[in-house]
Amino acid sequence: MPTKKKTTTKARKGTKKDFGEMTVKQVMQKMVQSAHLKTKGDVIASLMIEGFGAVPVVDAKDKLLGIVSEHDLLVAMDDGRKLGDVAASEIMTFNPYSIHPEAILPTLVHVFVASDLIRVPVVDAKDKLVGIIARRDVLRAYLSAGRAGC
């Protein structure tokens, strides 16, 4: 059964802190939809339709195990599989790249540039899922820091 964290976040508006010093925690989305290993693909697809482009897969203690992307679901469909018959564990990316909340945003910019990642799960020191951050969150933070003209 999917779980949903109950806190909300967005980039802090009006902050003029230097972008180079901003942390992932300041701009990450804390409201995260997650799934478990046995969550079916059609349930995950429903979450994605609600605006979540990737769904982290966690264990009972919210430890990050993997992530299912829109692409993963499309590959399953292209293979002729019914999403209602496919478990997250069958299509997810295991041990996805993740980042800690204290990491500075320029570090994440390098990750996004060097990879095809669009979203990165945010985990604490025990690999517990605490948020997710997307490319657009980083861009929003950059603009809110007043760096658009730089």
Label each residue range with its predicted role.
Residues 1-150:
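Tandem CBS (Cystathionine beta-synthase) repeat/Bateman regulatory domains
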